[in-house]
Amino acid sequence: MIRTDAKDGALVLFSGGQDSATCVAWALERYQTVETLGFDYGQRHRVELECREGVREALKRQFPAWADRLGDDHMIDLSVLGAISDTAMTRAIEIETAANGLPNTFVPGRNLLFMTIAAAIAYRRGLRVLVGGMCETDFSGYPDCRDDTMKALQVALNLGMDTRIVLETPLMWLDKAQTWQLAEQLGGQALVELIRVETHTCYVGERAELHDWGFGCGECPACKLRKRGYEAYLKGERVTEAPL
């Protein structure tokens, strides 16, 4: 594994959701410069992109020690991905399991494209670390969220760009309860509340009702996972101290 230190800058893939917001805080605690990157690929829950600036501003306002570290935000139009994807993430169709055993919310190649574009931006910006919220513990079976995929992608990107970029995935082995716990460790209850209220997870883009665990329809897989994780976090179930 390539070693990094606090002087290295980081580029965080930031969708506006719980996981990526936690990753932004994780990076701000570690690196002197942290930039963020979002993608508009025609997702049904595009409202998450509208949450991004609110999260960034709240982080700067509530955590002054991080304010000077939070740098530029980048937004990339990847509508072509939505155009070639016939999935419940980009179409108004019912969420179900496909014939291959994967949920039809899986967007083929999404994280591969995200990381490749992120690496190109990081290369241009002089940032050595990419941070993503991929997770192999509480996940929907997406193959591009697996640890093996990220490790292979790091090798391919460094070979293809003749550089030394590191892909960090701090949530890879955490369940959703531990992700809430990590937020508490990083920024106390203030960060937990910020993530609860300001971020968005719901696949169908519902943001009319604020539940105990945040906004959402409460019925889609993303909402159910977030709800279960938050309830387990409050009860202390399966929550040991999350590794920082």
Swiss-Prot record:
For this protein, the Enzyme Commission number is 6.3.4.20
Q: Which Gene3D superfamilies match?
A: HUPs
Q: Which SUPFAM superfamilies match?
A: Adenine nucleotide alpha hydrolases-like
Q: Which InterPro entries match?
A: QueC (IPR018317), Rossmann-like_a/b/a_fold (IPR014729)
Any Pfam family: QueC
Q: Where does ATP bind?
A: F14, S15, G16, G17, Q18, D19, S20, A21, T22, C23, V24
Q: What is this protein called?
A: 7-cyano-7-deazaguanine synthase
